[in-house]
Amino acid sequence: MRVLRIIAAALVFSALPFLSTPPAQADTSRIKDIASLQAGRDNQLIGYGLVVGLQGTGDSLRSSPFTEQSMRAMLQNLGITTQGGQSNAKNIAAVMVTANLPPFASPGSRVDVTVSSLGDATSLRGGNLIMTSLSGADGQIYAVAQGALIVNGFSAQGDAATLTQGVTTSARVPNGAIIERELPSKFKDSVNLVLQLRNPDFSTAVRVADVVNAFARARYGDPIAEPRDSQEIAVQKPRVADLTRLMAEIENLTVETDTPAKVVINERTGTIVIGADVRISRVAVSYGTLTVQVTESPQVIQPAPFSRGQTAVQPQTDIMAMQEGSKVAIVEGPDLRTLVAGLNSIGLKADGIIAILQGIKSAGALQAELVLQ
């Protein structure tokens, strides 16, 4: 039986005079929470390794020949001769190992790593990652990873059923990689620094520059910051300032942040996130639900006894359609609280609200950017 649910929404847009609403209370954040130093970005590392100690949930070596090749190469590097036929071990798996190398990381510090199955292993639970070198985009080795895996999901299997929850072919090793090489950094020798906003916005960029300049005038007598665009703010180091101390003082300054109004919709999960500055002009929404139920009831037709006929299957389909009465509702949202209350009053589920928001955007009444994921 299949059930098809169709949400119909008809929108009528009506222009209204400008509604004067009190401005929302401004949010203040530290600069370190909304911006990062351009010279202090992360770098991605990647490596290929083996996970051992699995309880029969590893790669089947016939389907994943690269796993057996890697296992033999590892044993040979350890001085163990591997000759003979093909191995039937199921407690080993080939994996890709990834990590982020944080800025200013020094040799000896540790970072987390993510391990993902490369072959046909069904679960990495209980496994251990064997020493794996992690390289950067330049091909140089910057870290070495090893350790016990932590898997969030689980899988149980019997003769006639299998139960899986979460992802069992991906795992993490907290603090599993040791930094072996330091990235070259010119931070100490820099004269100009660049702050990059994590959420680009012209208003926020100007406010960051103003706050930094107000601090610099009081401390050094001259402004030192200049906004370049919606994302970058250039900061010039005063001659008498220590760069590390200057950045420590700047990143703790508070700024009034501002972001564009957005509505983010994830149609797969039915998640709707509405920003605080989203506004909806008055619209009339007519909505109704049409449910189509399709039922398949195949019938088996047996031949007559002692005849040469064959058993046949005759398909039989029953279709039933049900439609609820359509209603007309007025939706208007001069602020977030009123908007959410208006959408909840309609009484629709998430998929219905998503369809209505898309229609309101098409009608030009949604004063925000609609982001579909």
From Swiss-Prot:
Keyword Signal tagged: yes
Keyword Signal among record annotations: yes
Keywords assigned: Bacterial flagellum, Periplasm, Signal
GO cellular component, one term: bacterial-type flagellum basal body
GO process terms (BP): bacterial-type flagellum-dependent cell motility
Coiled coil segments of this chain: none
Top-level taxonomic group: Bacteria
Subcellular location, record wording: Periplasm; Bacterial flagellum basal body
Residues of the signal peptide: 1-26
Cysteine-cysteine disulfides: none
Molecular function (Gene Ontology), one example: structural molecule activity
Assembly: The basal body constitutes a major portion of the flagellar organelle and consists of four rings (L,P,S, and M) mounted on a central rod.
Family statement: Belongs to the FlgI family.
Role, per record: Assembles around the rod to form the L-ring and probably protects the motor/basal body from shearing forces during rotation.
Name assigned to this protein: Flagellar P-ring protein
Annotated organism of origin: Agrobacterium fabrum (strain C58 / ATCC 33970)
Gene (name only): flgI
